[in-house]
A protein has these predicted regions:
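Transmembrane-lumen/periplasm boundary regions of multi-pass, lipid-linked membrane glycan transferases
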Residues: 10-144, 153-164, 173-178
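Short conserved active-site loop signatures built around small residues
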Residues: 149
Length: 178
């Protein structure tokens, strides 16, 4: 459904996590995993093309150019709408991550990662968050809601961090908004 709704950009939320699976899940049978990912991508492409090709034929040359280039790759290099600099998302992060950024326990646990290291769950979240954020920052067209699919990854990351150091102290687990 994602490819039909938003085009191939939805793959940015899936492929980095899939490609980085050996990092977040050591011991994973890589050939089987990669084969499954390839099969899923090809299946999704077949479903999307089953709609896009007849639509392009019916809509004519200009419509075909817009759905296959203008609405996808054309937005990456030279957006016709919402063109913003690569750093545009950075000043918005404090607002997007409020009130989590005010949570002292989260910061303590983040600092503790230097000595404890990253487990598979944290690596999974980072494999989802960081590449997608970096790629969306490089794409010329930017809208704040493009980052909404990253919120679950951040929530999982924050939850895993906090659960790793849980002492059931009200100061650690109480939200800043409370």
């Amino acid at each position: 459904f994602g490819v039909l709704a938003k085009g191939p950009v939805v793959l940015l939320h899936l492929l980095p996590v899939a490609a980085l699976a050996p990092w977040w899940r050591p011991g994973l049978p890589w050939k089987r995993w990669a084969g499954g990912v390839l099969l899923a991508v090809l299946g999704g492409a077949a479903i999307a093309l089953a709609w896009a090709i007849p639509a392009a034929i019916q809509g004519g040359e200009e419509y075909a150019r817009m759905i296959f280039w203008g609405q996808t790759a054309g937005r990456v290099a030279d957006s016709f709408a919402h063109k913003r600099p690569f750093w545009w998302y950075l000043p918005l992060l404090p607002v997007l991550l409020f009130p989590w950024l005010l949570w002292p326990g989260l910061w303590r646990r983040l600092l503790a990662l230097k000595r404890e290291g990253l487990d598979g769950g944290l690596r999974f979240c980072l494999a989802w968050l960081l590449p997608v954020f970096a790629v969306f920052s490089l794409i010329s067209g930017k809208q704040i809601h493009y980052l909404v699919p990253l919120f679950p990854a951040f929530a999982l990351f924050a939850g895993r961090l906090l659960a790793g150091g849980m002492r059931f102290d009200v100061r650690t687990v109480a939200t800043p908004a409370a």
